[in-house]
């Protein structure tokens, strides 16, 4: 750009774009430079709108930047932190998603499998312990000790401890509903 009265052109600074006397973006006959605003990126004196989903462009950007893990970018002008129970593990996330059933998300950047004796519904921040006299099930309702999504009451004829469901098998014993041992 050439400021009024200058004999030689001045290179446009990194993160800036060139404008004419009316502050309109131009590539020729530029008289000044302006700082690249948030939501745009500027390179070689030109200003471009940041339009790629999952990216953002802070002030003085020279290119779109992927939204960092643990956050998401609905618009290129802002980064939004994911809430607990949401999952934003990868960079470039456009929208958060709830933590998957069978997993928990103590931090938005990680999704951990539920351990034995616990279950995790969709969006769980932490695992929920299986209650006494109950057993854990997968998404199809089948008994499981890993990646459980819910708990069910222990039916008659079974005893349930630590999320496990075991049939009563000793002769002369029975197991009423919610049993934790053979009686």
Q: For each of these PLM feature ranges, what is it?
A:
Residues 1-183:
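Disulfide-rich, cysteine-dense extracellular ectodomains and adjacent flexible linkers of secreted
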């Amino acid at each position: 750009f050439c400021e009024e009265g200058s004999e030689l052109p001045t290179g446009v600074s990194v993160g800036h774009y060139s404008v004419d006397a009316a502050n309109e973006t131009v590539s020729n006959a530029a008289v000044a430079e302006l700082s690249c605003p948030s939501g745009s990126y500027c390179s070689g004196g030109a200003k471009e709108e940041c339009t790629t989903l999952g990216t953002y462009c802070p002030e003085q950007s020279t290119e779109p930047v992927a939204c960092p893990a643990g956050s998401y970018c609905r618009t290129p002008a802002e980064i939004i932190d994911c809430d607990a129970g949401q999952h934003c593990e990868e960079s470039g996330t456009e929208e958060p998603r709830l933590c998957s059933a069978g997993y928990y998300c103590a931090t938005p950047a990680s999704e951990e499998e539920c351990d034995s004796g616990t279950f995790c519904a969709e969006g769980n921040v932490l695992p929920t312990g299986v209650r006494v006299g109950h057993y854990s099930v997968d998404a199809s309702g089948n008994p499981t000790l890993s990646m459980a999504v819910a708990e069910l009451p222990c039916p008659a004829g079974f005893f349930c401890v630590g999320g496990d469901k075991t049939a009563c098998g000793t002769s002369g014993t029975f197991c009423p509903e919610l049993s934790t041992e053979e009686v």
